[in-house]
């Protein structure tokens, strides 16, 4: 199945389900580390909402692309804690919190809600009662009524595309990104242009939908994978996909995967630069940028000395968020071989040190009027 349409991507884009060794629930420590870097931004966003004359009785918040790991629980806890702090300061008596957890229909909502505990949401007798609902669907379209949201949070989700970029075959139907699954140094310029164009289209749709749902002066805190370089083929931004493509190509050479399946597969994901994100937000015109920054984190658990353990841990993280979409293209039966090959490639690259991962924090306010 080629990922050429939004419907097909929506069917296979989700994190590994359950709570097993390869599940996202057990391998989300890196995204948890990323999200923790944005905790202050989220706290400030809640503080800002209370400084505006909303006359709040209930704060409506959503976590878009919440997946099924513990990270979304930390988001709920942070919002609730800040609301309780403001309630004590302002002597509020009736404030409530409504949180909507959103992801695509294939998301493991069962594991997600099984993990919700009284420690996360508290009880209804507390000073800020918390109510949680699931909202399945694509955040590239409308999910909520007009002017219904005060706060939008999303971590490591907005960089996923609605489909593989259009125009990656020539007039004869031959692949233009042969042997690769993302932008690389050998990709022709049209591949880079197609990826940026698709991200521009999708992020604009995201902003347009939120502009209708978020109340005037409401806030959005977005964390997405990005890059520091202006070059989208820079190894810092594409090394995961580059190493996966090498692993897939080795299985092609062994006759375990058809070469055509590799040549026709392009991952529906784009890691933008800060300048590209800023340009799209300003062109859309619905939100002002209150804060934007990029930061780097080690891609591996550097405290682990054994390079094989580090390589295996990195593979588990990558497998947790790539296996559903990769197995859809290449087959479930070769996944163990593929990720074992990936581990060997990662370990061999450790000698040259894998690049750090760049993330972007973006805080937006809905323009009033």
Curated annotation (Swiss-Prot):
Coiled-coil stretches noted in the UniProt entry, renumbered to this chain: none
* UniProt GO BP: methylation
- Repeat in keyword set: no
Per the record, the pathway is: Alkaloid biosynthesis
The EC number(s) given in the record are: 2.1.1.160
- Give an example GO molecular function: caffeine synthase activity
Keyword tRNA processing in the entry? The reply is no
The entry marks the following residues as binding S-adenosyl-L-homocysteine, namely 24, 66, 71, 103-104, 138-139
Site (Involved in substrate discrimination) residue list: 153, 225, 269, 317, 332
Q: What does this protein do?
A: Involved in the biosynthesis of caffeine. Catalyzes the conversion of 7-methylxanthine (7mX) to theobromine and of theobromine to caffeine.
Name of this protein: Caffeine synthase 1
Q: Report the source organism.
A: Camellia crassicolumna
**Quick one: which gene encodes this?**
TCS1F
